[in-house]
Amino acid sequence: MANPTGNQPVSYPIFTVRWLAVHTLAVPTVFFIGAIAAMQFIQR
């Protein structure tokens, strides 16, 4: 992350592959945690 030329990201696209990898893992994880937490409060 130490870039001597300034704050221009030169060699890596920040939000293409990394953004997709984080969100394809994070979005279903948050959804299932919310669904499991909601199921704890459902009485039969």
UniProtKB/Swiss-Prot annotation:
Keyword Iron carried by entry: yes
Principal cellular location given in the protein's record: membrane
Cofactor annotation comment: With its partner (PsbE) binds heme. PSII binds additional chlorophylls, carotenoids and specific lipids.
Family: Belongs to the PsbE/PsbF family.
Role noted for this protein: This b-type cytochrome is tightly associated with the reaction center of photosystem II (PSII). PSII is a light-driven water:plastoquinone oxidoreductase that uses light energy to abstract electrons from H(2)O, generating O(2) and a proton gradient subsequently used for ATP formation. It consists of a core antenna complex that captures photons, and an electron transfer chain that converts photonic excitation into a charge separation.
GO cellular component: photosystem II reaction center; plasma membrane-derived thylakoid membrane
NCBIfam families in the cross-refs: cyt_b559_beta
Cofactor names: heme b
InterPro entries the record matches: PSII_cyt_b559_bsu, PSII_cyt_b559_CS, PSII_cyt_b559_N
Self-association and partners: Heterodimer of an alpha subunit and a beta subunit. PSII is composed of 1 copy each of membrane proteins PsbA, PsbB, PsbC, PsbD, PsbE, PsbF, PsbH, PsbI, PsbJ, PsbK, PsbL, PsbM, PsbT, PsbX, PsbY, PsbZ, Psb30/Ycf12, peripheral proteins PsbO, CyanoQ (PsbQ), PsbU, PsbV and a large number of cofactors. It forms dimeric complexes.
Residues holding heme: H23
Membrane-traversing stretches: 19-35
Organism encoding this protein: Gloeothece citriformis (strain PCC 7424) (Cyanothece sp. (strain PCC 7424))
Protein name, entry field: Cytochrome b559 subunit beta
Membrane-related topology note: Single-pass membrane protein
Any GO BP: photosynthetic electron transport chain
Keyword Iron: yes
Keywords: Electron transport, Heme, Iron, Membrane, Metal-binding, Photosynthesis, Photosystem II, Thylakoid, Transmembrane, Transmembrane helix, Transport
Places the protein is found: Cellular thylakoid membrane
GO molecular function terms attached to this record: electron transfer activity; heme binding; iron ion binding
